[in-house]
Structure formats: structure tokens, C-alpha cells
Amino acid sequence: MTTTVETAVATGRVARVIGPVVDVEFPVDAMPDMYNALHVEVADPANAGEKKTLTLEVAQHLGDGLVRTISMQPTDGLVRQAAVTDTGTGITVPVGDFTKGKVFNTLGEVLNVDEKYDGERWSIHRKAPRFDELESKTEMFETGVKVIDLLTPYVKGGKIGLFGGAGVGKTVLIQEMIYRVANNHDGVSVFAGVGERTREGNDLIEEMSDSGVIDKTALVFGQMDEPPGTRLRVALAGLTMAEYFRDVQKQDVLFFIDNIFRFTQAGSEVSTLLGRMPSAVGYQPNLADEMGLLQERITSTRGHSITSMQAIYVPADDLTDPAPATTFAHLDATTVLSRPISEKGIYPAVDPLDSTSRILDPRYIAQDHYDAAMRVKTVLQKYKDLQDIIAILGIDELGEEDKLVVHRARRVERFLSQNTHVAKQFTGVDGSDVPLDESITAFNAIIDGEYDHFPEQAFFMCGGIEDLKANAKELGVS
């Protein structure tokens, strides 16, 4: 289950190098197991006269003592006949409190501080929890964010897809969730940066340091410029750290993957390098299997959970593409961040009509919660249907009933906005946590017309009912 010391069990020789694919010859009676990590020393091109250690992962047994491996680093300087050592175990990463506030690569090496680690390490290749270890009941994960809790409730131990382009508030929402898990649930977060831009990873680390959430977070990065083997394994490395917090420290964990599409893309590259026949649209034939091995480990065990938020890039906006389509099969909720909503200054810019949740159903949530969510969605949908008429003829041409719908829908839309804790350094305004019961009461009251006399501005960026009344009082209405 755990590995603390690497033990060399066999030595082989490099037989062939083709880019990140390295064939290694071993004695037939000392073959390394599948997914074992192999080490080979090569000359470091960046530092003349110095050596560096490459890590290779066994991907195929070719027969006659030959194994095909994928390198986790660039293979510059690697030559045939170089000695290769089998570590006797898979790639391992540090686990436990040491990981908090640290930035790691796929191999578990610390990147942001010069600190050695001699403690416990776990292999990144692990089995999903057994069926009898799983939490049988479906439980809502309350965040304190009105629009999420009311309209797209998250499942404890579930998987949430996060859709959003650049500049619509995705990073702020991710940081806010990390903050709320740490402060409201006394939990910890793990962030896996899979195949994204190095600049974005650096920006995230800086912003998390500024907002004070990095000390409750472990970060693992395998960025866009790294070999496909690294990008394929980085999500597993992050998930292994999260599993330790769940299984050993008995904590609730929030696990972020940015971007899950890059995980699939890396798998496709590795599959091609290994000579497998491509499947639909050029993807790997084992796409569903690879995705399942990752997603099935993200779950609730008895009393503790890993809840996952996964940023999803949709190639060419085609939801039927095999990569996003395979991911959708595993999701419990989708949170869609909308540019038109963010342009109105409404944050979090969650689209209440496009976002969905599996548990927005009376079987899983209270009837009053379901009824309130349906009322909000109905009034917003009516408002959306009327917008074309308003744009062409103007609001004065609507009937009295439709005018009332628009009047209340605009207030509901603004009341879905909320100040966040992590944005306080920019806005100067404290974030708010709104209990679900208060959200239900407030939205029912707005739709029933109890606050029709309040100006629209009073509903903007406020928390619960008391905040709303305070805003209205400042605007001269009571």
C-alpha cells in the first residue's frame, strides 16, 4: 500500500530511443512489472559535466527481455547501452501534511522550495475503493454560494464539470471553493494542473499565495511543454495525495483538475507512440478505460470524500467529441460560467439555465429546495424568452403580467450574485456565506413580490436577506 524506500531489483540496458519512447533490455528472469519506474542516468545538456536521472515508466512487455517505456522527462543526452535500474515500484509521490503549500511535478519533486522529503510516499497507481467501502447515501455538499447550492447543488464525493472561457471568473471560483473547504469544512484541497500553460500555473500560485489559501492546498503540475507521459500521470499523482487525506487523515478533500481534456489528449499521444490502432477521431482505443481508472478513484468512502471539480475544454465546441463525451458520463453536476452574465458584472457568473445537477431532484434534496429552484429557473426562462421582444419593441410593449415577470426576474438574476472571500483584496468587501435554507426563503420571497419595492441595485452582490435590507436602506428604501 505504501512505499517509503526504493529497492533496486534489476539492471538493464537501453536498446532504442525514439523521442519519449525508450526500449530497455533486461535479463529474462528479472523483467520489471508493468508501470514500474525505471531510472537511468544521462549527461545533463544544461550543465556540462553533470548527470541527471531520467524516470521511465514500463508501458509494454515486447518479449525476449525487451520492455517499452515512456519517459517522464525529455530524453536529450540518452544513448544506447546506458544502464537502467528497476526501482521495483511504480512512480511514487509524497503524501500527508508535507504536501500542503508545496508545488510538485509528476514525480513528486518539490518545485517551489528547496526541501528534501524522506517521509511516506504512495504509488500513483492504486485501485479504486472496494464496493463495500463506498458511502451508500447521496449527500449534498453545501458551499454557501447561493447560485450553486440552490440551482446546481454539488454532491459530496461527486464530480463537477466546470465550463468557462478566459476571463469569466473560473480561477476565482476555484480559489473560493478551496477557501470554503478549508474554512467551512476544515478540509484540504489538491490542485492538478494537467497540460495547461505554465504562465497560468504560475499566475494561480501567485494568486493563491495572495489570497491565503495555498497553505491548505497541495499543487501538482505537468504543463503543456512536458512529455506526454508526464501529462498523462499528473492527475494520478494529485489524486494519490488526495486519497491519503481522505483515507488516512479522514478529511473531506476538494480535488481540482485543470484541464481534464489535456489528460485525454496526453493519453492519445502516448497511445500513438506505443503503436496502438487509433479509435474514433484519432483518440486512443482505451479512452473509456483510462478515464474510468481515474474517475472511479474519485469517490466517497464511509464518512469522508473526495469531491472533484474538473475544468473541461470542449474542442471546437463539439460536445459529441469523444473526449468531453466520455467525461460527461462520469459527472454529477455541470457549472457553466457565462460571458454575457459576467459582462453584467454578476459574479460568480454561473449560467442558471445551462448548469445542471444530478441531485436537483426531490429524491435527493428537500421538496422546498426543489420547488424554489424550479420557480427560479421558470422565471429566468420566461425572462430569456421575452428578451427578443424587448430588444425589438421595448419593454413598454409587454403586457402587465410579462412586465411583472421581467421586473422580478431581473431582481432574481442580480440576487444570484455574491461577494467572494478571495476577491476581498480587490473589492474591499467581505465575502458572504449564505445557508441553503436562507437562500430558499429569500428567492421565494423575491418571486412572490415581497421585495418589489426595493430597487434593482439593492439585490446586486449581496448575501442573504439581511444584506438585501441593508443595501435597500442605504439606497433610501426600507
From Swiss-Prot:
It comes from the Bacteria. Coiled coil: none annotated. One of its GO terms (molecular function) is ATP binding. InterPro entries: AAA+_ATPase, ATP-synt_VA_C, ATP_synth_F1_bsu, ATPase_a/bsu_AS, ATPase_alpha/beta_chains, ATPase_F1/V1/A1_a/bsu_N, ATPase_F1/V1/A1_a/bsu_N_sf, ATPase_F1/V1/A1_a/bsu_nucl-bd. SMART domains: AAA (SM00382). Keywords: ATP synthesis, ATP-binding, Cell membrane, CF(1), Hydrogen ion transport, Ion transport, Membrane, Nucleotide-binding, Translocase, Transport. Pfam families: ATP-synt_ab, ATP-synt_ab_N, ATP-synt_VA_C. It is found in: Cell membrane. CDD domains: ATP-synt_F1_beta_C, ATP-synt_F1_beta_N, F1-ATPase_beta_CD. GO terms for cellular component: plasma membrane; proton-transporting ATP synthase complex. Its EC number is 7.1.2.2. It catalyses: ATP + H2O + 4 H(+)(in) = ADP + phosphate + 5 H(+)(out). It is a peripheral membrane protein. ATP binds at residues 164-171. Its main location: membrane. Belongs to the ATPase alpha/beta chains family. F-type ATPases have 2 components, CF(1) - the catalytic core - and CF(0) - the membrane proton channel. CF(1) has five subunits: alpha(3), beta(3), gamma(1), delta(1), epsilon(1). CF(0) has three main subunits: a(1), b(2) and c(9-12). The alpha and beta chains form an alternating ring which encloses part of the gamma chain. CF(1) is attached to CF(0) by a central stalk formed by the gamma and epsilon chains, while a peripheral stalk is formed by the delta and b chains. Produces ATP from ADP in the presence of a proton gradient across the membrane. The catalytic sites are hosted primarily by the beta subunits. HAMAP family: ATP_synth_beta_bact. This is ATP synthase subunit beta. The lineage of its organism: Bacteria, Bacillati, Actinomycetota, Actinomycetes, Kitasatosporales.
